[in-house]
């Protein structure tokens, strides 16, 4: 599949979230997304001011796309396209999350994400 015909990261995330809302309903797993998309894209004065305020409020650059909490343990899932690479901020966040005792994975497709979540025991 050519890169142009493969799904965007956002499309994979939407597909995964729709699926997880079905399979995790009432299962004692909390999952959510951190709204930090486009943090590096603020170019106008208003955008920079908003980004600065969000950072002061605790928004953290590089946070994984999906966060899961199950039985007191945190799991972070970063979604990428086939040849996608983590940003410097994402690599820093990954190291910090692992150092804090969380599990972290980078996945490259819907199926890859489902397999990782099964391996973690988030879904069966």
What residues fall within each predicted segment?
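Catalytic phosphate/metal-binding cores of nucleic-acid and nucleotide-processing enzymes, i.e., regions
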Residues: 1-124
């Amino acid at each position: 599949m050519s890169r142009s015909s493969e799904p965007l990261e956002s499309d994979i995330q939407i597909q995964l979230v729709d699926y997880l809302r079905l399979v995790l309903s009432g299962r004692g797993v909390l999952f959510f997304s951190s709204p930090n998309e486009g943090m590096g894209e603020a170019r106008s004065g208003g955008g920079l001011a908003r980004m600065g305020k969000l950072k002061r409020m605790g928004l953290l650059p590089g946070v994984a796309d999906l966060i899961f909490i199950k039985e007191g343990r945190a799991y972070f899932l970063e979604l990428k396209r086939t040849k996608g690479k983590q940003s410097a901020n994402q690599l820093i966040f990954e190291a910090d999350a692992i150092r804090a005792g969380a599990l972290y994975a980078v996945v490259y497709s819907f199926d890859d994400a489902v397999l990782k979540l099964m391996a973690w025991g988030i879904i069966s």
